[in-house]
UniProtKB/Swiss-Prot annotation:
Domain of life, source organism: Archaea
Listed PANTHER family: INORGANIC PYROPHOSPHATASE
Upper lineage: Archaea, Methanobacteriati, Methanobacteriota, Methanomada group, Methanopyri
GO biological process terms on file: phosphate-containing compound metabolic process
Protein name listed in UniProt: Inorganic pyrophosphatase
Function: Catalyzes the hydrolysis of inorganic pyrophosphate (PPi) forming two phosphate ions.
Gene Ontology cellular component annotations, sorted alphabetically: cytoplasm
UniProt: substrate binding residues: 31, 45, 57, 141
A Pfam cross-reference name: Pyrophosphatase
Length: 176
């Protein structure tokens, strides 16, 4: 069986175009996680709060970030996909974030195969209100679990690409 974290390349042209393996579809309150060792998706928990995921959420294959997990990615989609869907995505920004004091940044991206997003290249091309909604959700969604998160702000496409290169290098150091 193919392991979506270990066997799939980070993308066709990283860091400019990457693969996003979706774990959680937009609109879901269920937090699914990919079990990297066993190669399947499992329900980690249902969010304790009334929040739902505002975008499709997943990870970039063959990456490892500072929190010890694959690098997270959020993909702006018109319609939600499903756990296990692989999207070819163009990074446009980076949400800097702490989760229980661990660096847990998230790449923001758009699908390369949707003509609605062909001109979206950086954060300036995204409505500020959408960025505020995303940051608000990730600032508050764990509060009722007694956990703390802090969104430190947004950085542009160049920062996202730097994070991707860093995460690919960390993966290679750890897993060869």
């Amino acid at each position: 069986m193919m392991n979506l974290w270990k066997d799939l390349e980070p993308g066709p042209n990283p860091p400019d175009v990457v693969y996003a393996v979706i774990e959680i579809p937009r609109g879901s309150r269920n937090k699914y996680e990919y079990d990297e060792e066993r190669g399947f998706f499992k329900l980690d928990r249902v969010l304790y709060s009334p929040f739902h995921y505002p975008l499709d959420y997943g990870f970039i294959p063959r990456t490892l970030y500072d929190d010890g997990d694959p690098l997270d990615i959020l993909v702006i989609m018109q319609d939600p996909t499903f756990p296990g869907c692989v999207i070819e995505a163009r990074p446009i920004g980076l949400m800097k974030m702490l989760d229980d004091s661990d660096q847990d940044d998230k790449v923001l991206a758009v699908p390369t195969e949707d003509p609605r997003f062909k001109d979206v290249k950086d954060l300036d091309d995204v409505p500020k209100h959408l960025l505020d909604e995303i940051a608000h959700m990730f600032s508050e969604y764990k509060r009722l679990e007694g956990k703390e998160t802090e969104v430190l702000g947004w950085e542009g496409a160049d920062a996202a690409k730097e994070a991707i290169v860093h995460a690919i290098e960390l993966y290679e150091e750890e897993h060869g």
